[in-house]
């Protein structure tokens, strides 16, 4: 088990390192960020002094080496726009993104798992047809379009919900629905498929032959043994919810990390972009690590192999 944990830790560090390296070079393809923060009529001498102070006159290899050295100490530099520590700025926005992502994940589970299980148990029924039809539709509709339509209908026309921002419970409704729609649809289809496969297993047939109540057969025997694919997808979805929050936060003016990252990219605020990628990478890999540990509880054979 110790070797397994060390292996996963090494993989986590490698993923974070490669992510930061890729983004470090990619963000520089967008051009010189200094020109966005200085007057158009600035003298060439002043421009050069400003670039020298920020270290942008150094060769790219030197900039990269300096960046890696500082990143090891959690120092991503100062935001070019906000003039404050980049990592601290990112961490201040992270709670809002986590709140939205966790609320969307809870909505995903509350909708997808019951729909998937009932569709499998009542295979071929009207409920199955409507549930899976809705799931296909949920995967097909783009999130940004759904968000705009919901704002138009529920905020502009009906006035039931706020158009954006972060405040009370009503501010969560539309962003959560938009963020969860695709993932709930995908999880519902996977849950149905996984439960259908398990229902044909011998231990389920044996449980039914013993006369156990259907709720016990489904809840205790079927659902737990169907859970590994669902947990795998849930782990992936949790990480992707953080990425999907970028679009959702932009549409609904949610003051989270996703919106900050988009603004930083548009402004070529390299320190903030790199700090955001670092936080996203660490969060995503930790989620996958937690999912791996959960496998051991669901399937003891996984622990034995580890």
Label for each model-derived stretch:
Residues 15-65, 155-174:
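Hydrophobic alpha-helical transmembrane segments of membrane transport/permease proteins
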Residues 57-113:
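An internal, D/E-rich "acidic patch" concept
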Residues 12, 93, 97, 133-136, ...:
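Residue-level signal for discrete positions within transmembrane alpha-helices
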Residues 2-4, 88-129, 166-306:
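Alpha-helical transmembrane segments of integral membrane proteins
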Residues 29-30, 138-141, 242:
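Transmembrane helix irregularities
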Residues 16, 20, 24-28, 144, ...:
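Membrane-embedded alpha-helical segments of multi-pass transporters/permeases
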Residues 6-15:
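N-terminal signal-anchor/signal peptide hydrophobic helix marking the start
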Residues 128-150, 174-178:
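Pore- or pathway-lining transmembrane helices of multi-pass membrane proteins that form conduits
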